[in-house]
């Protein structure tokens, strides 16, 4: 009876069933549309003092129609920079220059964008769910919103304070 079930996109609280564990996606692998080349991450990540005190928004709406609303809201926010990227390497480099990044769900609840953000010391911004609460219990730094509309009420001062709060956890990388 001593066994555990590991699952990606686990949207059931691990508090309710101790035999369940969330299994993170991680970054894309090279067999996944040839996007996951590790050399996309080989460059000097900007020091946290030089990162933009904004939220990076760069995602398409093809994988999940809920993203259309997230994109609309992000364009209304004063602290979100919406960008399109020409290729994967440029996307990762741009991502690394921001303190925060919007990480809406993809085909499932998890998204590679979440893990790519952490690799370049950018805080993922996510919408709360049982899945996100499972990740929170793993001590992963993230900004959790109850509703994407909250993006319109966050100030740059809020972002600065939140980044400083999460920075030790982000630098330690013990998650």
Predicted regions and their residues:
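Nucleotide-sugar donor-binding catalytic core of glycosyltransferases
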Residues: 1-115, 119-140, 166-174
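A charged, aromatic-enriched C-terminal amphipathic alpha-helix characteristic of glycosyltransferases
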Residues: 153-175
